[in-house]
C-alpha cells in the first residue's frame, strides 16, 4: 500500500529551485520522499525524526542524504487523512539551530492553514 504524499506551494517552489541548483541533492530528496510514500508513518530513523519544540506534536523532518556540504531537511506532518504533507524544505548547513528556529514556526502555520482549509 502506497501512502499519499501532498505538498505545499512553498515546498514545491523550494524543490523546483533545488532541481535547478543541486540536482544530486534533489535526487536524494526524491528518493527519501519515495521511501516515505512506501513506508508512511512507520518510516523512522535515520530518514525521519520528530521535531522537538513544535506546537504540532506530530511535526517531523525528512532527512535525506545531501550532496557536497549541504544538510537538506524537509519539514512535514501527517494530516488527519494520514497523508504526508511536505510543508517546506531547506538546507540547514552552517546554521543548525537558527534554521529550526526560523522554519518551525513557518511549517506550523502552513500546517494549520492547510488543515483549516481542508475542514472548509
What are these regions (language model features)?
Residues 1-71, 80-84, 91-120:
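Basic, Lys/Arg-enriched alpha-helical interface segments
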Residues 74-76:
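Hydrophobic/aromatic beta-strand elements that line small-molecule binding cavities or substrate pockets
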